Amino acid sequence: MSSASSLAPVRALALSPPRPFRHGARRLARAPRAAASADPSPTASKLEGAAAEAYMATLAEDLTHLFDDRGIDRSLYEPTVRFEDPLTKYDDIEGYLFNIAMLRRVFDPTYTMHAIALTGDWEVSTRWTMDMSLPLPWRPSLTFTGTSVMGIDPATMRVATHFDTWDAISTQGFFLETKSPEAVAEVLRQVFDLTVQPDLETPEYVVLRRYAEYEIRRYPDVVVAETKTGGESGVSEGKRLAAGGMTGGGGGGDGSFNPFGALAGYIFGGNAEEKKMEMTTPVFTSDDGKMQFVMGRALGDDPSALPAPNDGERVGLGIRTGGVFAAVRFNGVATDASAAEAERRLSERLARDGHARKPGAPASLAQYNDPLTNPIRRRNDVLVEIEGFDNARLDL
């Protein structure tokens, strides 16, 4: 992962003025109101209209340089800018810039902004994802999502306060002042997640929200080779969420059909061109009775351009449709029971947090490791598609 920042499609909103932010409170986005078009002046009572749009565009562009060689423009910030997040607190621009430099040097971060909005008379908020890595033997990756609430000094049009929130914790503010262990616990939970992702090509996804117990991710469409985990006896007998042929057996009428072996045979030369293709990760199995191997990006995005499978009755080529999915991770040997329990917990959390599962969409299990991997280090994700998710919202 490289030190970089990127700007996802940004939406500028004019929202009604917020209540003052309190330690321990979760910020709520308010209903939109109409914006005026007047430019700010020394007597302006609020930032609005074209001036607000221009200011947010400038700030959004500058934040794309948060972790690159150019860095942010310090002239956009007050010398006495006050910064606070769940782990750190600084009271001037030098501390602010030191924190950015430290993150870049130690964690090799990538920053993606998803939305920027006017959330008060002189307040702008952003929603973002930050991915980091640590140079430790087990190569931990850390992901944080949250909001930045920036107060603007009307006299100078500079950022005077910057307050970061994390979606993964409920008590916001600097932990030494809130006396909450949540932020430290969240960092340690990610650092000491010992599950490992193999050095194989993996479909990229964006984490839109990282909560303490699950993530919401955006996946692209990917080309897949697929088969039924039920073999010739049909889906009903092989309707298994867990690994099918990866753990032996796949539900065929005589127990001999191995869905993993059928797909592996295709990519390792069992096709019309005898073409050998690279193994990727993860292997997807779903509770509608399918197992899928993701085809490498170098093979293109058209399934019809791939060599035909020799076992055309059992192995097919198609598209695994992307979208917004909730995901929960667990380690160990994935079984039908462990995957079903993970799905149950995930569904409960989604209902609690107001996210709706897409009706009729199957749950799926993503398995990243081969059977020789120590079970403690195996990564398994259960995914369920959700609908009606608004990534620009600042309160979820």
Model regions and ranges:
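N-terminal chloroplast transit peptides
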Residues: 1-25
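Short, aromatic-enriched amphipathic alpha-helices that serve as compact interaction elements
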Residues: 46-68
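A beta-strand edge to alpha-helix "cap/lid" segment located at domain peripheries
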Residues: 18-27, 32, 131-195
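A short, structured loop/turn motif at beta-sheet edges
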Residues: 116-123, 151-159, 319-322, 351-357
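Hydrophobic/aromatic beta-strand elements that line small-molecule binding cavities or substrate pockets
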Residues: 111-117, 145-152, 315
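A solvent-exposed, acidic/Ser-Thr-rich amphipathic alpha-helical stretch
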Residues: 57, 61, 70-127
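A solvent-exposed interaction/effector surface
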Residues: 186-396
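N-terminal mitochondrial targeting presequences
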Residues: 1-8, 28, 32-42
